[in-house]
């Protein structure tokens, strides 16, 4: 039986995924369950980047997501004002990324490929653990590291870096909040709740699942199906009550293959 994928990423990303899935022959709709806001303190983000630019050592900025990258460079540009040149990446600095989407965002913002470190494109997972496996043997003692992220999030990687002797600071380059669904999105949510077998949810964050639970309190999920981009996210979907949950790599090609497998039965 065919099914339509519900892409719950932030609105702009969700719409892009819908188009990419359509090109692969997969029906999809955007139902954003996370809204992205700008950095709450652009001046603080710019100050961090200025320190990186002025450093004579080899500082590292760890970007945890594409939103972290885009929010960071937008905040720097905003703080420096209209007419200022676009921020150029200092080649003595390294940009660490947790996955291919973050790498793509860095390249889009002008970071040279030779300055980027990330898990291999064929890695089984794209997360802090996979990134740490790539850089654990770097010389971290007294090295300056900025972790660029949104509000909240795990501190696992930060703790590994501190234990290795790095001077770790956290920079918030964007904020994640619960979405304000428009009328069409609310109607789509109602359809998905009324006919769960017609849909497959695609989750790329546990926070999106929490927002879904808040938007549909008391809903039954035992007939619903989901794809999750990480085991922790799959655990959260299972805990909410989803009847079938599969783990899939965070790419449209992988999602298309998983949808085909899930709907074959």
Q: Model-derived features: where do they sit?
A:
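Conserved beta-alpha
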Residues: 1-265
């Amino acid at each position: 039986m065919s099914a339509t994928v519900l892409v719950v990423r932030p609105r702009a990303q969700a719409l892009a995924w819908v188009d990419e899935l359509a090109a692969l022959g997969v029906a999809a709709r955007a139902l954003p369950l996370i809204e992205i806001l700008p950095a709450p303190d652009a001046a603080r983000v710019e100050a961090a980047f200025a320190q990186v630019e002025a450093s004579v050592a080899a500082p590292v900025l760890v970007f945890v997501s594409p939103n972290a990258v885009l929010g960071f460079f937008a905040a720097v540009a905003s703080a420096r004002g209209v007419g200022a040149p676009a921020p150029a990446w200092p080649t003595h600095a390294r940009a660490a990324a947790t996955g291919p989407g973050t790498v793509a965002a860095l390249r889009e913002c002008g970071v040279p490929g030779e300055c980027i470190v990330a898990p291999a494109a064929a890695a089984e997972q794209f997360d802090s653990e996979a990134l740490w496996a790539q850089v654990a043997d770097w010389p971290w003692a007294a090295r300056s590291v900025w972790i660029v992220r949104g509000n909240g999030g795990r501190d696992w990687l930060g703790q590994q870096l501190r234990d290795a002797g790095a001077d770790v600071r956290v920079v918030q380059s964007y904020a994640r909040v619960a979405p304000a669904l428009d009328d069409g999105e609310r109607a789509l949510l109602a359809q998905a709740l009324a006919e769960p077998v017609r849909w497959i949810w695609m989750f790329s964050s546990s926070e999106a699942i929490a927002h879904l639970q808040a938007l549909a309190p008391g809903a039954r999920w035992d007939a619903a199906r989901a794809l999750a981009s990480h085991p922790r996210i799959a655990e959260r979907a299972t805990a909410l009550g989803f009847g079938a949950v599969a783990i899939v790599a965070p790419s449209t090609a992988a999602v298309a293959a998983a949808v085909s497998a899930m709907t074959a039965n």
